[in-house]
Amino acid sequence: MGDMKTPDFDDLLAAFDIPDPTSLDAKEAIQAPSEENESPLKSSGMCIDENVSLSHSGSAPDVPAVSVIVKNTSRQESFEAEKDHIAPSLLHNGFRGSDLPPDSHHCGKFDSTFINGDSARSFTSKLEPSKSEPLPTFNQFSPISSPEPEDPVKDNGFGIKSKHSDSYFPPPPGTVGGPVLEALSKFPVPELHMFDHFCKKEPKPEPLPLESQQEHEQGGQKVVEPHKDLDSSRFFGEALEFNSHPSNSIGEPKKLAPELSACSSVPPRQRLKPAHSKLSSCVAALVALQAKRVANVTKEDQPGHTKDSSGPTKEGSKGSPKMPKSPKSPRSPLEATRKSIKPSDSPRSICSDSSSKGSPSVAASSPPAIPKVRIKTIKTSSGEIKRTVTRILPDPDDPSKSPAESPAGSTITEAPSEAPGDEGTAMPVEEHFSEAGIHSGSPQGDRKGDENMIKTSDSSSPCRISGSRVPKGSALNSQASKKQQSTAPQASTPAASLLPKAVHLANLNLVPHSVAASVTAKSSAQRRSQPQVTQMTVPLVHQVKKAAPLIVEVFNKVLHSSNPVPLYAPNLSPPADSRIHVPASGYCCLECGDAFALEKSLSQHYSRRSVHIEVLCTLCSKTLLFFNKCSLLRHARDHKSKGLVMQCSQLLVKPISADQMFVAAPVNSTAPATPAASSSPKPSPTLDNASSVIPALPLYPDPVRLIRYGTKCPECHKQMRDYMVLATHFQRTTEETEGLTCQVCQMLLPNQCSFCAHQRIHAHKSPYCCPECGVLCRSAYFQTHVKENCLHYARKVGYRCIHCGVIHLTLALLKSHIQERHCQVFHKCAFCPMAFKTASSTMDHSTTQHPTQPHKPSQLIYKCSCEMVFNKKRHIQQHFYQNVSKTQAGVFKCPECPLLFLQKPELMQHVKNTHGVPRNVEELSSLQSSTDTSSNRPGSRAPAEPPATNVAARGSSLTAGRWGRPEAHRRAEARPRMRSTGWTCQECQEWVPDRESYVSHMKKSHGRTLKRYPCRQCEQSFHNPSSLRKHIRNNHDTVKKVYTCGYCTEDSPSFPRPSLLESHISLMHGIRNPDLSQTSKVRHPGGPSPQVNHLKRPVSRMADAPGTSNGATVSSTKRHKSLFQCAKCTFATDSELEFQSHIPQHQVDSSTAQCLLCGLCYTSTSSLNRHLFIVHKVRDQEEGGEDIVEVKVEAPDSEACSGEEVAMETKENGLEECASEPLVTDLGGQQGLALDEDSAQDPQNQPQASQDQNSHALSPQV
């Protein structure tokens, strides 16, 4: 006891002070934490004592902030490094023990470990004598505790070493209580800055005088005293504990200092701040206020340490004469000390009063009053220190804080034995930090605080702070924020370092670190009713800083990356004749700044495809797919307009292939491709809409009095300006497509009016309103107008791929497309999650990685382009059909060709330009007459003829051209369609527009299951289109071109292609490169071809009938052909003698067998006989010779029989020729054969001669 040095009162209370802002330069950097001296305002030095816990009172809900004593400059890293190098004789609070020599430079300074309550840490070996560290206290939860990182230490006025070393108390071994009293009496007592923070309406502070700088230096001095019996830091630690928790009355004198040291630590986020932060404006404001109060005190406190305790108290009260004593301004601890301190009976008894201002509680709306607390420290003879903190009732002149408004607090004892407590009620703790901790006004900090508080267990955390407790409208907050914006530059550090420098209570997380935390929760009613004595342990205060996840970095990079492409500026001066109305600034993209002259261009800009961005929006609770950055930003802007901030939990960014970049953008409207059409789904009957929206009108004008143009919609009874606006009304596309699909024909209609008009088509009910243009038609002409003029049934339901936007006509095609283009099949290993493209790779993997496992086949898994994986194929198919209704899109198919269009006007323009339409009634009549004979198909049904229009009464007023219009109309009605479209049910005679609907109709209505491709002309159906085409070609094709062999005498085969015929002639007849010009015939299913009969009947008689010109033409052509042709060369002649004299030159020798009919040579007679039998249909050479003689008789016999009808029936591929059909032969040609009288006298040989002539004489023709 005797050799224990007691700290001076001035030095003790100087720890509550803050530096002089007049000597601070906000632009200079504070020395880094690695330097020996540390700035008291440096936020990066705040640390946590992980090994000490605090004693704390109050229940968790009522204590929004723990009692945290924060020193802004302490080095957590250095502390941990020095943890094992502490002198054994140092006291717990940093005071030197009696076994250490006094140090004039350090005995009066409070070490950072002492200030922060670090009981086992010291940095005296690293502190230079000329550098001292000022000690700001109670700054953890106020803006003054968060200086900007660039405030230097040397410019704060703390580097000036003054006469404070003289006032450092010496270490007399026997007198401890006296020096402590003297130190307390001489210590300058500034305002408690924790409560200065809550002075919202203080007058503007004035600059500090020079004396305040010295006083601040004194507050920055740190003391390292030996540790033997006296633990003097507990006194100061208790005062800090009180300020942190004003509701706690100290009655136990032992356990507070160890926990208090931990409470003064700082979140890791503050420790990690760089050394270039700047002084907050709140620091300057509050320091200036403090300097006025202690200006006169410092002058008298500096000379020595032997002054009376009453002196500083009185002078301190005089040092701040201008400070207001309003309920909203904090009261100085000097006043409390002057009013409440009384000399103790024991020299080791120290009493001091302190007052502070607490922030309003959550429910309190009135400004809080300043509580008064008495701190009593008693040093017993056994070396123990007892401290008691009790609340003093407010003064009568302080009406802002009544006892009813201040719920009773609790008393904390710090000694093993109970200490006598002072009378009075204790002040609650929760009001003091709820506002101070969140005063920075950072919503990000508030959110982090909420998250941290949620992580804290209820039993270990008495602190519950939410962002809703942030006071708004605070003058001090606004002043601090303005000055911070003007002085502190924005840093380029991550978001955590961009937070305000004030220590946010919302950023503190309370978790027990090294000492078990025990919290005694008390209800608010008990706290407000009576003072209570409670012992508790406050957990460490720190913040668990989590690095931003990668998804956030990627998302921020996508959102905030600069646009490398320069802004696009359009030409906003279109030609005058274009009739395009362009805004003055064009249509501007709010995301990237590009401008466009047309609104459609802007929509295409938003729908461009440049990157694949898949985001799971937490606000929408669904996964969204974007193909460019602008569409993503527009979605985020939509949330921002509602006051929300877009957040994502999943993000997938990947490039897209070049073939998917330029696919057609999905079009949701069937209206013309104009900006006004897409922007105004419901055109109003105004001149602007009528001129800007051009609907798809009928292909050609209808005949007179068959349709009636109206201006009123028969469905919604809305009046329109003209028929064009009415057509636009029926063709507009609504966003809601639910209930617009016809259940009969599965057609997707654009809107409700068009849907109702379409339903009446199936019901055959009037009024007969066209669903496309809205005109009213007569029932007889209605189907023709709808099918052919307005092309209503060209509407098809398409299915758009959600991955690439390609539209398919059927779901089966869409499924095949997704499986081929957007799905991948992998072979998964049976023992691990690895999957490979091929089964062999999986096998190799199993062999190398799982050699001990039994062999198992790989499992097929299916991966969709949306990154979902399925282990069964049916699951991925179900995945495809989940949102089928959302993928439907209206398309238009040309009835003449397989082209598809996304907009109706494009289809109409294509039909006009490519296929042609009549422009008037006369042209319509000519078109009908030209298509009457060629378009008559079995499945086509001509509409009924409408009743004739009575125009005779108006004959005088009609022109000559108008008289024929009813007849032209009848012809137009009677003419069949240019192309047979759709299917007609043979049972109910219902016409169905598309194939899928026909198959569905047959199954639902008649119970017949058809295959996928039914035939229009019969009831057969097929699985694939090639089988259907073959069926139509063989059974229903009206014009079929066949190739028949002319060398075959009987049952000549026909071939569909000339190549097959050429092969046949080469193989069967031995003729290479035959002339096929006369072998193609046109065969009609209903009757035989005249040319086929001509081949079978080369000789025909002559007839004078004019209707048989075809037979005469064929006969004339035949007469010019030679009868004998050499098969070895190109020689041909009509003379048999000349032919017989020609062929011997091709005979190699006399022993070679040669055919006398074609000149071919064979090695043996058997081969020749086989040739004669197969080719010439003769048994042997002699029979062939007889055939030649019989050929010579044919011509005169046919001439003799001229003028008579020959009745013959010949079958050609199953086709019969009428027996009475006359065959005409032109005898005007030259006769190639001489008349033989003998053969003419034998008419019985005529049939045989005719047959022989067909087999032999026709050979040269082919």
UniProtKB/Swiss-Prot annotation:
Chief place where the protein resides: nucleus
Keywords from the UniProt entry: DNA-binding, Isopeptide bond, Metal-binding, Nucleus, Phosphoprotein, Repeat, Transcription, Transcription regulation, Ubl conjugation, Zinc, Zinc-finger
UniProt subcellular location: Nucleus
Positions with biased composition (Low complexity): 343-367, 484-494, 924-935
GO cellular component: nucleus
Tissue: Expressed in the brain.
Span list, region Disordered: 23-45, 122-174, 200-278, 294-494, 924-979, 1222-1262
An individual GO BP term: negative regulation of insulin receptor signaling pathway
Record's compositionally biased regions (Basic and acidic residues): 213-232, 298-308, 964-976
UniProt biased composition (Polar residues): 454-463, 1241-1262
C2H2-type ZnF: 587-612, 615-639, 711-731, 740-764, 768-790, 799-822, 827-850, 892-915, 983-1006, 1013-1036, 1043-1069, 1124-1146, 1153-1176
Residues found modified as Phosphoserine: 78, 142, 145-146, 529, 573, 691, 1089, 1198, 1202
Covalent crosslink: Glycyl lysine isopeptide (Lys-Gly) (interchain with G-Cter in SUMO2): 200, 204, 546
InterPro entries tied to this protein: Zn532-like, Znf-C2H2_11, Znf_C2H2_sf, Znf_C2H2_type
Pfam families associated with the record: zf-C2H2_11, zf-C2H2_ZNF592
Gene Ontology molecular function: any one: insulin receptor substrate binding
Role played: May be involved in transcriptional regulation.
Family: Belongs to the krueppel C2H2-type zinc-finger protein family.
Quaternary data: Interacts with ZMYND8.
Protein name in the entry: Zinc finger protein 592
Source organism: Mus musculus
